[in-house]
Amino acid sequence: MSSFKDLKKNRMSNLESLSKQVEKLIEKPTYGDDRIWKCERDKSGNGYAVIRFLPAGQNEDVPWVQMWSHGFKGPGGWYIENSLTTLGKDDPVSKANTALWNSGIESDKNIARDRKRKLSYYSNILVLEDSANAENEGKVFLFRYGKKIFEKITGVMNPEFKDETPMNPFDFWEGANFKIKIRQVDGY
């Protein structure tokens, strides 16, 4: 049990501790994940990086994870959550969207369109070149990407034409570097 003498002696350290707690409350929360790498843009809106997709980890079948998510603004604020359909389960938002879509009412269909789930893929990558953040070079990160990049990956694995040789872009030794080029065009 603390005595008054101890309380008086420790009052400044208690003040410091309380001040730190107040600072934590005032700080705006960050929702970013330091494990996920993003190609940063320069002041003109352009970005460039070279990455290497890494093979699947031990006990993993494929070197990517497919993730469905919802992100929309409703009457009570923003709803940003991963969809349960990622786990093969029924998702309440997807069920509600289906009901809205099947109503046949165009305004309901528009709501369902705004709330539809979005597909992302995640893979481990090695950053070989990062023009905006050189300190990332040589480090391993998670990389979140969409359908278009996934189609490029599957395109080299299963080429469309006979004269193209299939390649595993996730092969550590014989894979390929992947160049990311982001260009600002007409304000977009």
Regions from the PLM with identified roles:
Residues 181-188:
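Short, charged beta-turn/beta-strand-edge "cap" motif at the junction between a beta-strand
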